[in-house]
Regions:
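S-adenosyl-L-methionine
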Residues: 29-58
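C-terminal substrate-binding/active-site "lid" region of AdoMet-derived donor-dependent transferases
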Residues: 72-136
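Glycine-rich SAM-binding Motif I of class I
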Residues: 4-8
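Gly/Ala-rich phosphate-binding loop of Rossmann-like dinucleotide-binding domains
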Residues: 11-12
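A short SAM/SAH-binding and catalytic strip from SAM-dependent methyltransferases
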Residues: 61-73
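Short beta-strand-to-coil "C-cap" segments at the C-terminal boundary of structured domains/repeats
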Residues: 137-141
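Conserved SAM-binding motif I beta-strand of class I
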Residues: 17-22
């Protein structure tokens, strides 16, 4: 979740509920402070835990990743996400902002994931960084 800004923005813009997972207690404390001043803080939950241990709740149907962690941890997180969909089938979309090529290569090999779209975000920033994009996958069980 980092400082929680994406979660707070999304809950404000879309009226959704958001859960942010952060493992660093200092960054988590900053997210909690941001939540106090956020207009949509009541629809935002921040948890201090390791993402690879997180049990995905049944109501989760969108997951946002911002270049979050190592490929080894990503594998565990994707396993938990797909297991949640096997237990409780539903539409579930995964959004990867600023993904590493290693992430995309791995995600393309996961049988339960289907590539949906790619949003080019290079126009939002100076330069031509090819990682400035959002790649979307759907869990397909």
């Amino acid at each position: 979740c980092g400082k929680g800004r994406v979660e707070l923005f999304m809950t404000y813009q879309t009226r959704c509920h958001a859960i942010g997972i952060e493992y660093d207690d200092r960054i988590f404390a900053t997210a909690c402070e941001n939540k106090k001043s956020g207009i949509s803080g009541e629809r935002t939950t921040f948890l201090l835990e390791n993402a690879e241990n997180y049990q995905v709740p049944i109501e989760v149907d969108r997951v946002f990743f911002f270049n979050p962690f190592s490929i080894e941890i990503l594998r565990k997180v994707i396993a938990a996400v797909t297991a949640s969909c096997y237990e409780n089938p539903r539409e579930l979309l995964l959004f990867f902002y600023y993904p590493q090529n290693e992430y995309i290569s791995y995600l393309m090999t996961v049988d339960e994931l289907m590539f949906v779209d790619e949003i080019d975000c290079r126009d939002l920033f100076d330069g031509e960084n090819s990682r400035e994009r959002i790649v979307i996958f759907e869990v397909s069980i």
